[in-house]
Amino acid sequence: YPLMLRLMALDPAPSVYLARPCYNGRVTAPPCDSALWTQARYSAEVVDSAVAVARRLLSQRQSQTLLLIGHSGGGTLAMLMADQLPETRAVITLAGNLDTDAWTQYHGYEPLRGSLNPARRPPRDKHLLQLHRVGENDDTLPPPMLKRATETQWRARVGTVAGYDHSCCWPQLWPIVLETTVQAAGSGAWAGR
């Protein structure tokens, strides 16, 4: 199971798992195109689709606020979605790819030409809480890459977790991450830069 599904099981609060379009066995179903899970995996089309689902869920539940959480590429989408969802109170990323250009260069991959890059967007709203965590042994998204990607953000808290890598051990930390976020959101903490 994807990491985020395992983490959701540890949280008693209501939550929804939003998979990226054309992932999880649906790559050949229309309107999927290989670009939507390769070069355009973070395209405006993908982000708009996720935002539309979030808006529908907000209206169905008559919710006023939203907490976006993502691991790896899910963190990329969470940051891009927050730009369009003013209801977003906080974004949490675990090993989040917040600079897709730096990531492709680091690994020697082709640039994601059809995708948006969170690092190229203006700083997020000053009221948006951001908690970003990365494992010290993460060689998929090394800690310095995440730190550089968040330098211009107003209320970003970046933490490196000893002994963790890209996927190892996050369920152990999850209850603490949730508690920290709830406390910070409720108290108006995280003064920012």
Where are these regions (language model features)?
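Post-His helix in hydrolase/transferase enzymes
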Residues: 169-183
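Alpha/beta-hydrolase-fold serine-hydrolase catalytic core, especially in secreted/extracellular enzymes
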Residues: 188-193
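Primarily recognizes the serine-hydrolase "nucleophile elbow" in alpha/beta-hydrolase
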Residues: 55-110
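The feature captures the conserved acid-bearing segment of alpha/beta-hydrolase catalytic domains
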Residues: 96-168
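Active-site machinery of serine-nucleophile hydrolases
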Residues: 1-40
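Alpha/beta-hydrolase active-site loop
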Residues: 32-60
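Stable alpha-helical elements in mature extracytoplasmic
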Residues: 3-7, 46-53, 73
